[in-house]
């Protein structure tokens, strides 16, 4: 089965409305208000859609989040059963401080086709390569770079890698620098970071490192439409993380998840820019309109494009 084409516009609208709502808080130094505004707008729009939706990636578990929590049902409760993964405001600090990279993100798949990830860290690696064997979480940094360079018929110093700029990545960053790999260090936003491998125009050959598990699922949802390779392994820092994972049905705590184990079947992904970023531009005002850009993918229709939208300010 596949998702009806009508859902492209419906979920595009959801992403845009969440982005527009949080835009009012850009630069106001209040990341909580910016996030809440995006959450409220996204939830309201989702509840208008003729579907039986269930949140599998959201703002946390029921005891942590009043809205868009894991397991929450959304929609009119008629129509197809869908899994929904959301990050109404990726880059809360970016929005609060008017820095590049704030996004509103949603991914949708048919029921039971989207992995419900625990709120924990995930070690990730992705590249625009066709299959296993070229890069792998269990390979050394040197082997991953060497294999990727061979596959792309390049020298290691011609490759570019994207990684979150965190103390935990100090050793990896040093190894990449020793190999003369070009580095793009990002301060936050590992959904958009992973997406940079999707198209050669972004000039990023590999994304690697430890970031959020839910963000890994969202990134995989988009990369699936681009036939990219993605692999992730959850990292559990304490017993509470382990118990949460087991409660969600994760028995093998050391398992490496491939893209087709995170998302299967058809899917739609939307990411709307709030502030300027590498993938999409931020919201601008022209005359009496908000102008926004959204990356949208729909796997079954082979839709992969950036859509520019216009919304009247008084809407």
What is each PLM-predicted segment?
Residues 7, 196-315:
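Oxyanion/phosphate-interacting regions
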Residues 176-183, 191, 195-197, 204:
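Glycine-rich ThDP/TPP pyrophosphate-binding loop and its adjacent helix/strand module
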Residues 79-90, 94-115:
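DPxDG-like acidic metal-binding loop motif
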Residues 67-69, 97-99, 117-120, 172-177, ...:
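Short acidic, glycine/serine/threonine-rich loops at helix termini
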Residues 105, 110-185, 277-284, 288-314:
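Acidic beta-strand-loop-alpha-helix segment within the catalytic core
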Residues 1-85, 146, 150-152, 177, ...:
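N-terminal subdomain of lithium-sensitive/metallo-dependent phosphomonoesterases centered on the IMPase/IPPase/PAP
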Residues 55-59, 84-86, 95-97, 116-117, ...:
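General beta-strand structural signal in soluble alpha/beta enzymes
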